[in-house]
Amino acid sequence: MYHHDSGPHIEEVFDPPSRRTMMQEIETHPDVIAFGKKLRKIKNQPESTFLSSADRMEEIIDAFRDQIAKWEEEEELNEPCEYRQLKIEIFTQKKIEYQRKNNLAVDEFYKKRNLKNHSNRKPLEESRRREEPRDRVHESNIDITHRGDSTSLNHYSRHHYSQRQSQSSRFERERESDEEEENSQPIQRYRSRSPKPSYSYNQSTMQQSQRDDTNVYHRSHQSTSQPPQVRMRSGKSRVTKTHNRKFRPGQKALAEIRKYQKSTDMLIQKAPFVRLVHEIIREQTYKSQDYRIRADALMALQEAAEAFMVEMFEGSVLICNHAKRVTLMPTDIQLYRRLCLRNLS
């Protein structure tokens, strides 16, 4: 109790409400109730080709983000409020939670797709691993001293090494072409694998080894290539990414047009428009601070500005269509100003 000349003055001190009480009041707030209805409407939308689960999650996150931005603008324009700050905090936590769920779902999707691609690639790798040891075993069984003393060992080794190199590279190319034909046609078609003629003195021995090599390759390739005729090639998964979907030309623009036609919200952000109005008033009143403007007056100015801009763009698009164009250009807007806005400097 304080005493002054005019008499005693009583000052009352109130305890701030508890967090639980504030939460109960926030749950019954009209903005929160309207947002809950909007959220349920998004969740109850049926599945279609233009709306998948990932798009629905992104739409929910955007709704949280827009609501938080709206409250932050109110916090900037008006006095600080504990209830509003608590609502911003709660909705921010909810938005982060939905973003975490969305990221986990995306990671799980790509993990499953990689596992599926790996399982499709496994039969091809196993068949290649089976063929490699057979080739190595056949190479180790070749007897390079078959001709005895009449054959030069060094000369035979060099010739055999170059011949084996060209033959192995040719076999690799033919094996790849045969694998491609397996995936397109079930019937095996082999190219002629006749070796190049050799004009050295050991021609008969080389031809014999090449024939044996070709027969072994035919047997190994036929035995390993018959079962996996029904396998799928790697990279041909039917699962596609949802957020990289291709749209037809103009589809996104039409969706945005329908969205803005259904909404009754302002298209210009409130805070920048208020700052612009204050700046214009300050310039016109020679930087004096003796002015006030009501919130409904600002709303009326914003509605008038949006109506004027919409009408101007409608006329400019009509001029653009008259010129047999679909792209709006600055000359269309300038022509509209000359025709319809002569008094506007």
UniProtKB/Swiss-Prot annotation:
It is found in: Nucleus; Chromosome. Residues 263-340 are annotated as: H3-like. Residues 122-149 have a biased composition (Basic and acidic residues). One of its GO terms (cellular component) is nucleus. GO terms for molecular function: DNA binding; protein heterodimerization activity; structural constituent of chromatin. The record marks R128, R129 as: Cleavage. Pfam families: Histone (PF00125). Residues 233-246 have a biased composition (Basic residues). Residues 117-246 are annotated as: Disordered. Keywords: Chromosome, DNA-binding, Nucleosome core, Nucleus. Disulfide bonds: none annotated. Its main location: nucleus. InterPro entries: Histone-fold, Histone_H2A/H2B/H3, Histone_H3/CENP-A. Cleaved at the onset of meiotic anaphase I, likely by separase sep-1. Forms a nucleosome-like histone octamer containing two molecules each of H2A, H2B, cpar-1 and H4 assembled in one cpar-1-H4 heterotetramer and two H2A-H2B heterodimers. Belongs to the histone H3 family. Histone H3-like variant which exclusively replaces conventional H3 in the nucleosome core of centromeric chromatin at the inner plate of the kinetochore. Required for recruitment and assembly of kinetochore proteins, mitotic progression and chromosome segregation. May serve as an epigenetic mark that propagates centromere identity through replication and cell division. Not required for chromosome segregation during meiosis. This is Histone H3-like centromeric protein cpar-1. The lineage of its organism: Eukaryota, Metazoa, Ecdysozoa, Nematoda, Chromadorea.
